[in-house]
Amino acid sequence: MAQYKGAASEAGRAMHLMKKREKQREQMEQMKQRIAEENIMKSNIDKKFSAHYDAVEAELKSSTVGLVTLNDMKAKQEALVKEREKQLAKKEQSKELQLKLEKLREKERKKEAKRKISSLSFTLEEEEEGVEEEEEMAMYEEELEREEITTKKKKLGKNPDVDTSFLPDRDREEEENRLREELRQEWEAKQEKIKSEEIEITFSYWDGSGHRRTVKMKKGNTMQQFLQKALEILRKDFSELRSAGVEQLMYIKEDLIIPHHHSFYDFIVTKARGKSGPLFNFDVHDDVRLLSDATVEKDESHAGKVVLRSWYEKNKHIFPASRWEPYDPEKKWDKYTIR
């Protein structure tokens, strides 16, 4: 008796179609997953590119001040892009080195674990391999450290065309301080040399009439030291000075009463002026009052007067003592008045 096989045939066909659809569904899922992964990769690339572009754009804005030409702008942009690409490449290289180093460390950890577990001895070949791996690891560590130092030294954002002299710089400040100290020491040595130079002082002991004497002093000596030496010279000729002390004497130069604490150096360096002549010259010329050209300043001066204070108090209302006044360094005498 013949059997009807149509139902079995249809069932087999249906099974085949179901398997085919299942396979297509799996392929579709794989395709969707691949597309999603590609989109993620593309998004990461876009983000990197965007960050890269934003960093370059920000640096370009900060380094460009004022009006610049289009060519200059393009040149700066290209330079910044190249510099940024170098930094990114170094960063990637550093990451690769870090990964290699981690792999080597992991491998070393596994080997160490095997050594602890296994009681078998290692062959010479394995020991040599371990030494080579340690050397390779040390090489990677050294290279990674060098990369980090280079990256720190060469940071993006420093434009060599920008003037940074106003910014604090420790090395520059130390160099400036060193030069300043050298100049100060050189100046002080020069001033000490000037102070040690000898000058001849012409002075006149004044008791109503003049009695000229000369004495050699150093430019660094004070008026008190000068008066002490002048007193030693004058005592043998003037009896009223034999019992006098330095504090009882006054020194009058160009109609100004000079305080005892001032030195000749003070007047020489500042080229100080008095009422009737310069205070920085202490020799005397016979033609001090004969000026051939009134427009040319003469450096000729009068002999300074050494006076007893008691004589001045008695005669300060009489010429020439009536013209004398205390020296004031703030007061300027631009024109001399000789009478």
UniProtKB/Swiss-Prot annotation:
Chain residue ranges for the region called Disordered: 1-31, 150-177
Keywords linked to the UniProt accession: Acetylation, Isopeptide bond, mRNA processing, mRNA splicing, Nucleus, Ubl conjugation
Chief location bin: nucleus
Crosslink position(s): Glycyl lysine isopeptide (Lys-Gly) (interchain with G-Cter in SUMO2): 100
Motif (Nuclear localization signal): 152-155
UniProt keyword Ubl conjugation present: yes
Segments forming a coiled coil: none
Sites of N-acetylalanine modification: 2
GO biological process, one term: mRNA processing
Tissue specificity annotation: Widely expressed in embryonic and adult tissues.
Entry GO terms, CC: nucleoplasm
Biased composition (Basic and acidic residues): 168-177
The family this protein is said to belong to: Belongs to the FAM50 family.
Classification via PANTHER family: PROTEIN FAM50A (PTHR12722:SF2), XAP-5 PROTEIN-RELATED (PTHR12722)
Known role: Probably involved in the regulation of pre-mRNA splicing.
Subunit: Interacts with EFTUD2, a component of the spliceosome U5 complex. Interacts with DDX41, a component of the spliceosome C complex.
Protein name listed in UniProt: Protein FAM50A
